[in-house]
């Protein structure tokens, strides 16, 4: 079976390993000499660094909570929605493998602990005891699934567009004509533009509701 059909079959499967799928897409991309798209797929496999352009689907919204000594984590109500969004909107930089591991923990929410600076700033804003205050962002597990699902969908549509242009490959090779067509067809090389967005901070590292995470 040709490479593109193999990629399509994998991308259409429910429950496919997204990490394995991206590796297959990376192989096809490299064989077609689509260097920019290869770089994007490599970032998905290895994680995004500071300064990288981040795809919009990796921006997620969480729930701001404070740790009460009496009852545990409780929601923090902030009237200024713009201010609240500045804390609850996060960019996830971690690799697909890490995200899949977090999703597989099977908790309803993942906990992202805020930095000491963010804790002090929030405590001052809501007039809480700075020394006693500990804040976190609760990230819905479904948000992690959405990142993985969007990547799978991108790859499926990309493989279908390759087929539409007659770019299929023979075994694990592509002809010079197919390579040239892929490199000149805007429908194909413009897929790199789907992986763009603004840059922010934070990473999820662990998966239970009370677990500590580094920002």
Features from the language model and the residues they span:
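Short acidic, glycine/tyrosine-flanked loop/strand segments centered on an H-E-D-like triad
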Residues: 90-140, 144
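Long, low-complexity intrinsically disordered regions enriched in small/polar
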Residues: 168, 172-215
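Extended, non-transmembrane interaction/recognition domains
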Residues: 134-137, 141-182
């Amino acid at each position: 079976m040709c490479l593109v059909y193999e990629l399509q079959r994998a991308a259409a499967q429910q429950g496919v390993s997204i990490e394995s799928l991206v590796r297959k897409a990376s192989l096809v991309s490299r064989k077609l000499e689509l260097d920019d798209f290869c770089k994007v797929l490599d970032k998905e496999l290895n994680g995004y660094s500071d300064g990288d352009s981040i795809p919009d689907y990796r921006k997620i919204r969480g729930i701001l909570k404070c740790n009460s000594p009496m009852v545990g984590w409780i929601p923090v109500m902030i009237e200024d929605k713009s201010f609240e969004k500045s804390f609850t909107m996060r960019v996830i930089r971690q690799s697909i493998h890490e995200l899949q591991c977090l999703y597989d923990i099977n908790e309803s929410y993942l906990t992202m602990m805020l930095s000491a600076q963010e804790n002090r700033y929030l405590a001052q804003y809501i007039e809480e005891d700075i020394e006693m205050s500990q804040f976190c962002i609760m990230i819905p597990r479904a948000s992690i699934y959405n990142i993985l699902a969007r990547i799978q969908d991108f790859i499926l549509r990309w493989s279908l567009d390759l087929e539409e242009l007659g770019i299929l490959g023979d075994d694990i090779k592509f002809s010079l004509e197919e390579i040239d067509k892929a490199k000149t067809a805007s429908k194909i090389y413009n897929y790199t533009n789907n992986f763009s967005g603004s840059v922010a901070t934070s990473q999820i590292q662990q998966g239970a509701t009370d677990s500590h995470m580094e920002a």
